[in-house]
């Protein structure tokens, strides 16, 4: 409950700044990005540095819904010079901030940054912009909004003769199932770890649900886990996941393939 209240407070603060027009000032914009990063690291994303065990040196990590680069910067550090990160972010201002963050950390050479959305099929999609919340831009369901390129993860990572992904992070405001549908070959043949945000209301906008995501990934042999600060990542039951979503509004879940 506290986490949800704080998240809403941060979003409300940005809304006030956006309505005032002060967000257009570079210093204010940088300050908000810094505040957002602190919020993500300490209150929302949980013990994300534990994801490093799924992103070894020389590996390929994919950040779907990269926003301003909170995860992409970390992934790029972890893969080191012999690895690669694919960062996908469709919104212009966020994409520019993503590139700036990577340049600032001298990591841009390790990242293939795409101004696009990941979807079930390649082509063109439409993005609804939320001017009051830079992390709440959504795919349109009715063809309105800003036209953006759409790509499938399978098209970005051919399964023959290329590096296979070790981790895919997905946070796309309810369109997670569409991303997964466009990654069927990756899920089947590579079986990377997945770190996915589950938000019942957001998923419902696209005609799906938390239960549907769990079932879909179970069909590929994935099991849900809590990302733990220490020790093994504990298995998360469907009932526990639904309870956490009901309490907090959303939850981040680590999915790994079951051991044979």
Q: PLM ranges: what are they?
A:
Residues 1-260:
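Phosphate/nucleotide-binding beta-alpha loop and adjacent structural elements of enzyme active sites
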């Amino acid at each position: 409950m506290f986490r949800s209240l704080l998240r809403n407070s941060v979003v409300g603060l940005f809304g006030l700044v956006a309505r005032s027009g002060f967000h257009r000032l570079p210093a204010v914009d940088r300050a908000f990005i810094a505040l957002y990063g602190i919020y993500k690291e300490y209150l929302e994303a949980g013990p994300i540095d534990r994801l490093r065990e799924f992103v070894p040196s020389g590996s390929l990590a994919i950040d779907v819904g990269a926003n301003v680069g909170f995860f992409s910067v970390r992934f790029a550090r972890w893969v080191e010079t012999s690895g690669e990160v694919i960062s996908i972010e469709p919104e212009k201002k966020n994409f520019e901030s993503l590139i700036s963050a990577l340049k600032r950390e001298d990591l841009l050479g390790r990242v293939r940054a795409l101004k696009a959305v990941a979807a079930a099929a390649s082509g063109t999609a439409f993005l609804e912009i939320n001017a009051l919340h830079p992390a709440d831009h959504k795919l349109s369901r009715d063809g309105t909004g800003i036209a953006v390129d759409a790509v499938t993860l399978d098209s970005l990572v051919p399964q023959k003769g290329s590096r296979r992904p070790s981790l895919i992070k997905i946070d796309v405001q309810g369109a997670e199932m569409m991303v997964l549908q466009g990654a069927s070959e990756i899920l089947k043949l590579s079986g990377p770890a997945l770190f996915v945000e589950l938000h019942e209301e957001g998923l419902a906008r696209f005609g799906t649900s938390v239960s549907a995501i769990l079932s879909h990934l179970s069909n590929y042999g994935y099991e849900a886990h809590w990302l733990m600060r220490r020790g093994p990542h504990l298995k998360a039951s469907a009932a526990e996941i639904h309870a956490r979503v009901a309490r907090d509004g959303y939850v981040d879940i680590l999915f790994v393939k079951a051991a044979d």
